[in-house]
């Protein structure tokens, strides 16, 4: 498959173990190929009747799935992981076409997906409660039970990965899931749905409904939905909290960020530069946990800036399906204009553009309508600038300098976000001291933007709550029942 050739020819909803057209609609959406600007799909947004059918299907599957042993669920998840691994190139290609990230990155994303399913397959087979001895031979025990029908609402920057990260722990715990992808990237979640069915999941266990805000509202308000997990923007997260509160539904929110990356003067310079690039330019900078506020100690600022600019200018832009491309297009035209607007405003507020920040037109004529821009480095930034305070969600790195550890910690924590943070230093005591003081859910020491499925991921402050990945996520997709057993006579107060 090559750029400019892919067209969706099948329905994009998945219900009852098959692709289906929605029975009713709340509007239509178009999905684009960011590299070319070409429409690859026009689809109906699921209406209330379609959402109701998806929930009914999921409820029926839940009754079967929740009665299976942990080992039986483990076997299905392991088979799904095997199929994902087997179809890695196909999935990565579809992801690249619909999202715009390089095929190199997309393959790495798919690796984290089968790893996630394998990890939770192992936990499915080992979930257990506790036995508590009580006086007189009586005892109590706990049961970890599934919630029911869970809803996952995904973002467009990691469409397939987010679908896996939300569904794997949900299914491991015995739940069913209805997944709503972003309307910008509706395609790859269908591949996961088909894989689960092929792996032996009951029809309806993982359903996909397409749509925008209205479809999301139908899901959040549905009385049979037990839990919602959302990845996306803070304003949308707030609305989901409000809707979920009316039904007293537990939620997981993974929202935005404006994360600090602190570079101390004693760092390994080569690694720090690599870390800064990883913290800013993966997926064209469209990553919620990116370390876009790069604080560099004054003693090494000039050297660091020179090197990071040199390496940034080497990044290969172009057709995301080519093996040597390392940066593809942004997700769509409005988002490209938004990111370019941040760069323009930064210059107006006094920042200096050392490289990039401009529209890029690849030589290949089929890419001339793609949504490309050159990766941007900003210096002479201040903490009060818009580019330092607001999430840009594009390939824009803002560099600030600092003097002391105490100073940089105060400035790094001066944000309403708290998704991630990073520190580069050779001083191991300082590294752990700084990580302890940073107000963020995930802190990196001498690395950035690595996502082992064994480690929990999630935010502080307005970056959300709850966690993806790691053993703890089991607690967010299950509920604890206490059983108290009396082995003697009842001692009554009456």
UniProtKB/Swiss-Prot annotation:
Pfam families according to UniProt: Aldedh
Q: Where in the cell is it found?
A: Cytoplasm, Cytosol; Cytoplasm
Record Gene3D superfamilies: Aldehyde Dehydrogenase, Chain A, domain 1, Aldehyde Dehydrogenase, Chain A, domain 2
* Binding-site list for NAD(+): 180, 232-236, 391
Q: Name one GO biological process term.
A: protein homotetramerization
In the record, which positions carry N6-acetyllysine? 30, 298, 303, 344
Job of this protein: Converts gamma-trimethylaminobutyraldehyde into gamma-butyrobetaine with high efficiency (in vitro). Can catalyze the irreversible oxidation of a broad range of aldehydes to the corresponding acids in an NAD-dependent reaction, but with low efficiency. Catalyzes the oxidation of aldehydes arising from biogenic amines and polyamines.
**Protein name listed in UniProt:** 4-trimethylaminobutyraldehyde dehydrogenase
């Amino acid at each position: 498959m090559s750029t400019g050739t892919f067209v969706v020819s099948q329905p994009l909803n998945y219900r009852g173990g098959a692709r289906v057209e929605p029975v009713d609609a709340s509007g239509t959406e178009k999905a684009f190929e960011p590299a070319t600007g070409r429409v690859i799909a026009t689809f109906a947004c699921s209406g209330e009747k379609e959402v109701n059918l998806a929930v009914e299907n999921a409820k029926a599957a839940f009754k079967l799935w929740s009665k299976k042993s942990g080992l039986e669920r483990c076997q299905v998840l392991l088979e799904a992981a095997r199929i994902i691994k087997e179809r890695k190139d196909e999935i990565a290609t579809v992801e690249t076409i619909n999202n715009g990230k390089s095929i190199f990155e997309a393959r790495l994303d798919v690796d984290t997906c089968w790893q996630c399913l394998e990890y939770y397959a192992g936990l499915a087979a080992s979930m257990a409660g506790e036995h508590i001895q009580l006086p007189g031979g009586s005892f109590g025990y706990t049961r970890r039970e599934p919630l029911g029908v869970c809803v996952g609402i995904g973002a467009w920057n990691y469409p397939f990965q987010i679908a896996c990260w939300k569904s794997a722990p949900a299914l491991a715990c015995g739940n069913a899931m209805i997944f709503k992808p972003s309307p910008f990237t509706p395609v790859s979640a269908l591949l996961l749905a088909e894989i689960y069915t092929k792996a032996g999941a009951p029809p309806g266990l993982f359903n996909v409904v397409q749509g925008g805000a209205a479809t999301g509202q139908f899901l959040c308000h549905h009385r049979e939905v037990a839990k919602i997990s959302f990845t996306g923007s803070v304003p949308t997260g707030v609305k989901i909290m409000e809707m979920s509160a009316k039904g007293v539904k537990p939620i997981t929110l993974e929202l935005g960020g404006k994360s600090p990356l602190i570079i101390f003067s004693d760092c390994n310079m080569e690694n720090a530069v690599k870390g800064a690039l990883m913290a800013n330019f993966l997926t064209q900078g469209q990553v919620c946990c990116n370390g876009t506020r790069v604080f560099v100690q004054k003693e090494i600022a000039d050297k660091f800036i020179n090197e990071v600019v040199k390496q940034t200018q080497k990044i290969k832009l172009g057709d995301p399906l080519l093996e040597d491309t390392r940066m593809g297009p942004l997700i769509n035209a409005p988002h490209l204009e938004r990111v370019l607007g941040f760069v323009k405003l930064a210059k107006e507020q006094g920042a200096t553009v050392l490289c990039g920040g401009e529209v890029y037109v690849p030589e290949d004529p089929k890419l001339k309508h793609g949504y490309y821009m050159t990766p941007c480095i900003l210096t002479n930034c201040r903490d009060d600038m818009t580019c330092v305070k607001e999430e840009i969600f594009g390939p824009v790195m803002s560099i600030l300098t600092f003097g002391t550890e105490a100073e940089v910690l105060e400035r790094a924590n001066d944000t309403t976000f708290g998704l991630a943070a990073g520190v580069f230093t050779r001083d191991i005591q300082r590294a752990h001291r700084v990580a302890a003081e940073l107000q963020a859910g995930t802190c990196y020491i001498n690395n950035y933007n690595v996502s082992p499925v064994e480690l929990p991921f999630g935010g502080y402050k307005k970056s959300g709550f709850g966690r993806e990945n790691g053993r703890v996520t089991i607690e967010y997709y299950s509920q604890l029942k206490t059983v108290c057993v009396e082995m003697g006579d009842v001692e009554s107060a009456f």
